């Protein structure tokens, strides 16, 4: 009986691990395509209509909740001539994703290191947080930002 319980527990762990990997891989594909459309092609409208739910939760205090509010806030910055958004890495684990990038919405500024954090549900982005660190003119260490 003890062996049967142990075997069942092992099968459960293996299945659970495979499901988590499967979720991560599905979400990685979504986030990679979202990043391509949003940051590389700078097509805010298409990226958000394809991958973001209408009642999107926004934690950036400068942007209201909702997909349309995000489109309205981001589209002018992403369509500005000389704006630059260079994705450095994408990290996905289960339902969470981080896109780490260099962003410069206004070409007259030095830009910032940005970490956009997304939560996904059923293959769609449902929630967003962001962290911005302005690019310094001087650094206390020799390490680059990226």
Language-model features: locations:
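C-terminal and inter-domain tail/linker signature
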Residues: 19-146
